Regions:
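Active-site acidic carboxylates
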Residues: 1-88, 92, 103-108, 134, ...
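Structural motif
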Residues: 15, 116-119
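Short acidic-hydrophobic, aromatic-tinged amphipathic segments that line or gate anion-handling sites
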Residues: 81-84, 171-177
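Short gly/pro/ser/thr-enriched loop/turn and capping motifs at secondary-structure boundaries
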Residues: 88-89, 127, 150-155, 179-181
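Glycine-rich phosphate-binding loop signature in dinucleotide/nucleotide-binding domains
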Residues: 100-116
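A short glycine-rich beta-strand->turn/loop micro-motif centered on a GG-aromatic cluster
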Residues: 119-122, 140-155
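Short glycine/serine/threonine-rich phosphate/pyrophosphate-binding segments
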Residues: 125-132
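Gly/Ala-rich phosphate-binding loop of Rossmann-like dinucleotide-binding domains
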Residues: 137
C-alpha cells in the first residue's frame, strides 16, 4: 500500500539573514544590483515557504537604511531588522531571537530548534558575511551562503571569502539549488508556487549568476 504520509521539506528549520543591503553601500559594491535581484527572489521564496527573515543594517544613522527595492518584500515577510556596529550579524540582539528562555519553573522552549539552517545573502562577502557565517558555525548552526547573493567592493575578495567559508564548513551554493534542496520533494504543498517563482525569475537568475560567478 502506498505511503500517504505528506512529504516533509528536506530543510525544515531555516532562517534567512539579509546582511547590510544599504543605500550608501550600493555605488561601491561590485554588481550590487545583481545581489538585489537574488535577495528579492529569496525573500519571495521566504514568503511562500514561511521562513523567518532577519535583516541587519550597519550603523543606519550614518549609512542609511535597507535599499528601497527590498523594503516591500521585507514588509510582507514580517522581517526583523536589527541595527549594529559589529561586522557580524550574530549580535546579542540577534541571538536573543533564537535562544530558549528560562522560566522560574522550567525552561521555555524557543520556537526555533537548537540547530538551524541559516541562509545568508548580502554584503560584504569577506567581512560581514564571513564573520556572520563563522559565528553561526561556532554556535552550532548549518550555514548556506548563496554565491549569487553576496558581493564585496572588490570583486577579487568574493572567491577568496567563499573558498574560506567552504573550508570552515559552510555550504556555498546558488539560490536555485538552495530552493530545490529546501523543498526536497515535488509533492510538498508549496512546490507549484516555488516552481512558478523560479520560472518568473529565470532571466534575473541568469543575469546574477553570469555577473557574480563569472570569475569563480
Amino acid at each position: 500500500m502506498a505511503d500517504k504520509t505528506p512529504p516533509e521539506r528536506r530543510l525544515k528549520h531555516q532562517a534567512i539573514f539579509v546582511c547590510d543591503m544599504q543605500d550608501k553601500f550600493a555605488p561601491a559594491i561590485w554588481q550590487f544590483d545583481k545581489v538585489v535581484l537574488t535577495a528579492q527572489k529569496v525573500l519571495r521564496a521566504a514568503k511562500i515557504l514561511n521562513i523567518p527573515v532577519y535583516v541587519t543594517t550597519q550603523n543606519a544613522a550614518r549609512l542609511g537604511g535597507t535599499v528601497a527595492a527590498l523594503e516591500p518584500l521585507l514588509a510582507v515577510t514580517g522581517a526583523t531588522t536589527i541595527d549594529k556596529t559589529r561586522f557580524s550579524m550574530w549580535v546579542p540582539e540577534m541571538e536573543q531571537h533564537f535562544a530558549s528562555t528560562a522560566g522560574s519553573a522550567a525552561a521555555v522552549v524557543s520556537k526555533f530548534p537548537e540547530q538551524l539552517q541559516v541562509v545568508i545573502v548580502g554584503i560584504e562577502s569577506h567581512i560581514c558575511v564571513t564573520q556572520t557565517a563563522l559565528d553561526l558555525l561556532a554556535a552550532g548552526h548549518d550555514v548556506f551562503v548563496l554565491a549569487d547573493g553576496v558581493s564585496s567592493c572588490n570583486e577579487q575578495e568574493v572567491p577568496l571569502a567563499l573558498a574560506r567559508l567552504r573550508a570552515e564548513g559552510a555550504t556555498v551554493t546558488s539560490s536555485e539549488s538552495w530552493l530545490y534542496e529546501t523543498m526536497g520533494d515535488a509533492a510538498i504543498a508549496e512546490f507549484r508556487e516555488i516552481a512558478k517563482l523560479v520560472k518568473e525569475t529565470s532571466a534575473d537568475t541568469k543575469v546574477a549568476l553570469s555577473a557574480l560567478l563569472s570569475k569563480m
